[in-house]
Every structure is written in C-alpha cells, then in structure tokens.
Amino acid sequence: MSHHWGYDSHNGPAHWHEHFPIANGERQSPIAISTKAARYDPALKPLSFSYDAGTAKAIVNNGHSFNVEFDDSSDKSVLQGGALDGVYRLVQFHIHWGSCEGQGSEHTVDGVKYDAELHIVHWNVKYGKFAEALKHPDGLAVVGIFMKVGNAKPEIQKVVDALNSIQTKGKQASFTNFDPTGLLPPCRDYWTYPGSLTTPPLHECVIWHVLKEPITVSSEQMCKLRGLCFSAENEPVCRMVDNWRPCQPLKSREVRASFQ
C-alpha cells in the first residue's frame, strides 16, 4: 500500500521526504529557470515529435491530476532530438494547475509562475518498459509546456470535454484519436536540464525539456480543470486545485538553452 501523498498541508510537498527521502536529492524537479544563467548550447537539436493519434486510449483521474494515457507497446508515438540520445515513447500527459490565476505551474521563469503546466511523458525504449526506465538517469523525457489564461485553445477542448466523465478519483473513460502535437506552441525553443518526477516516487530519471513559449487556454477551459476532485465519489468533495510542487534547489546542475 503506497503512502497517501497529496498537496494538502498534512501530506503535501513539504512532507514528501518523510516517505520518499529522494525528495531532498541532488536532481529534483521542478526548478526556477533563470534566463540569464541558462547557457546556450548550439549542439542541442530541435525536438522531433512524431505522434500517432491512434495511440490515445484512456483518460484517468488518479486523485492527483488526470492522465491521458497512450498505447506504448510500439514506436508509433515517439519523441527524439533535443538533449536526448535515442528514441522515447509517449506514455501519458497530465497537467498541474492552481486555484487561481498567477500560480499553478511547477517550473518558473525569472520568478514568473504560469497558470498551469502541461507535462508530456516519454520513456527510453532501450529500457524495454516504463517501470524499468524509471530506474535510470536517462529513463524518461518530459516536455513541459506553460499554460496561461487568454484565448481558448481549440485543440485542448476534447480533453476538457472528457473531464465530465472522470470528475472523481478512480474514474476513467475511453479517450481515443488524439494527437498531442496540437497542444504544442508554434515555437519549440526549450531549456533542458537533468531532473526528476515532480510527484512521488520522485525518481531522478528525467531529462527535462521546458518550452520557452506558453500556450493559452480560455478561463472557461481553465475552470473545467479546477472542477475536478482529488476525492473519490463516496468521499467529501475536495476540489483538485494547486496540484503543483514548488521549485527545488538547482544544486550543481546546469540549465542549457536551445536558443540565444
């Protein structure tokens, strides 16, 4: 039985180290990105997204966020390039968000918090399966995309509409024919650094690529996220808001930029 971690005062990020001591590790995420301190690296490649909408399969409320899950049994939906060696398979995406505008993202840029942050998660095919990839420093590649309230994002509406069927913890629904490329901003410039999962078990297995350019979603779309519940159907209602981890110490790491 895993420890019931969450985002509340009694089980939130300040307590995670009690059950997951790696929370105080050397390469934890998220971090505060400083544009001045990031080093431009001309050797970094463009990110190459090659997704097949046919691999989308389900949307799940796991009591911490919602995951859109993909069939990762073949190389139909993959990420390559960036700071990566080899091929990384798409497994899921999820979002972290706030209770109000001005907070919700996990990474920050020059002290600025965005309203939400989308994480697209991939695992290194050389490790054979996701669970094995978690044990390696180059096991996962996560692309982080900042979200801010502004114009509606038509490409995310299908996701927003599906939330009605997974309002409470433990619910899941079929979610098919979806290509997450539509969620990316036009500019694919990024910062990259070695880090971790931002939720327990907090494994230090992630090569992060945080895109410089945010996407916008409407306030209505944002409100639908805040309408989800941390709680199960048979429990008192607990709204799913502020499911983000604060920035962690950079320690000896370097942040590199793909752009000048």
Curated annotation (Swiss-Prot):
The record marks 7, 62, 67 as: Fine-tunes the proton-transfer properties of H-64. Catalyzes the reversible hydration of carbon dioxide. Can also hydrate cyanamide to urea. InterPro entries: CA_dom (IPR001148), CA_dom_sf (IPR036398), Carbonic_anhydrase_a-class (IPR023561), Carbonic_anhydrase_a-class_CS (IPR018338). It comes from the Eukaryota. It comes from Gallus gallus. Inhibited by acetazolamide. PROSITE patterns: ALPHA_CA_1, ALPHA_CA_2. Substrate binds at residues 198-199. Residues 3-259 form the Alpha-carbonic anhydrase domain. It is an enzyme of class 4 (lyase). GO terms for cellular component: apical part of cell; cytoplasm; plasma membrane. The keyword Membrane applies. GO terms for molecular function: carbonate dehydratase activity; cyanamide hydratase activity; zinc ion binding. It catalyses: hydrogencarbonate + H(+) = CO2 + H2O; urea = cyanamide + H2O. Zn(2+) binds at residues 94, 96, 119. This is Carbonic anhydrase 2. Pfam families: Carb_anhydrase. Belongs to the alpha-carbonic anhydrase family. The active site is at residue 64. Its cofactor is Zn(2+). Keywords: Cell membrane, Cytoplasm, Lyase, Membrane, Metal-binding, Zinc. Its EC number is 4.2.1.1, 4.2.1.69. GO terms for biological process: carbon dioxide transport; cellular response to carbon dioxide; regulation of intracellular pH. It is found in: Cytoplasm; Cell membrane.
